[in-house]
Amino acid sequence: MEERTPLTMKDIAAHFGISVATVSRALKDSPRISVERRAAIQQYAREHNFTPNMIAESLRHSRIQPMKVIGVIIPEFAHYYFSSILSGIEEEASAHGYRIMVAQSNEQYEREVKICKSFYENKVCGIIVSQAKDTHRYDHFQQLIDTGIPLVFYDRICTGVNASRVVVDDYMGAFNAVSHLIETGCNRIAYYGSAMTLEISKNRYNGYKDALLKHGIQPDPELVRLCDNRTDAESITPEMLNSSAPPNGFFAVNDDTAIGILYTAKCMGFRVPEDISICGFTNGQRAVACDPMLTTVEQRGTKIGEEAADILIGHVEGTIPPGKIERRIIRTRLIIRGTTR
């Protein structure tokens, strides 16, 4: 898709100064379009090697469905949260007679672009995707939409593309977690989060900040760190805890980061939760495998996957009207365990 951008019905429509619907009818030889206009559009399409997504078209307009394959892009296979989402997608897709084709972006923009191209060439009937951390341009997503392939974002949504999405309520999840830390005695709470280029990062940070302000605590920039994995957490936490005004609470953007904080604090001789409290965000399997078990925000990954697949299938089969953008928000739940008082 990078070397030669596929011609889309939108491009043809722009060339002739007509609507995409008119182009679609002309390519299907509809008598509603004049013979001359049909011939001109069809010739232009042939000359420019236009290839419509026939699988998506057949699914959208016919009960005969020869190939029902959904492309799924996940950032990391190893992450429990994304694995649970994938499980939800597969269950919902299978229940409707669809198979899934899965690829991992490994948090790399270039790899994500290649996957989109591969899915396009393999004629998937729709794509469910969570963008990579490294993604900084969105042309590859827009091109898919322009070629008529339904696209649904989950978790990490792309605000630069008008497409359906399923997200958790990151703001309230963070707000409730930080409020719990404050209400159980913490007044200096550190925030470990991802880059603010991601919408989920902005929402979680705003939830953290607003919880502090609601409880009369002024946010301290010195307590905010760009850190979203265990390795980095173990590296930067000693400096934080050895500072002249150390935090007595931590809110981390995911469980792995929170567990890195927990491990480091215990190695330094701090008692958890007596000396410091820690809260994560995911509620994966590792949250109950650490000592003490982790207080965390449950994201309900399986539910996210089910909803994303439900929307995608709705777009493909036409039960969701063409052009309608579905936005679904999944509520979080605070799971209180041993790392908070």
PLM regions and their residue ranges:
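Hydrophobic alpha-helical segments within soluble ligand-binding/sensing domains
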Residues: 164-191, 203-210, 230-239, 258, ...
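Flexible loop/hinge segments that line or gate small-molecule binding clefts
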Residues: 107, 130-176, 197, 256, ...
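Short beta-strand elements in bilobed, periplasmic/extracellular small-molecule ligand-binding domains
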Residues: 93-104, 191, 209-231
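Flexible loop/turn connectors
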Residues: 236-341
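N-terminal helix-turn-helix DNA-binding module of bacterial transcription factors
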Residues: 1-64, 341
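N-terminal helix-turn-helix/winged-helix DNA-binding helices
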Residues: 2-8, 46-81, 85-87, 96, ...
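An alpha-beta-alpha
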Residues: 175-217, 222, 322-339
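Short, solvent-exposed amphipathic alpha-helices that sit
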Residues: 80-95, 173-177, 199-218, 260, ...
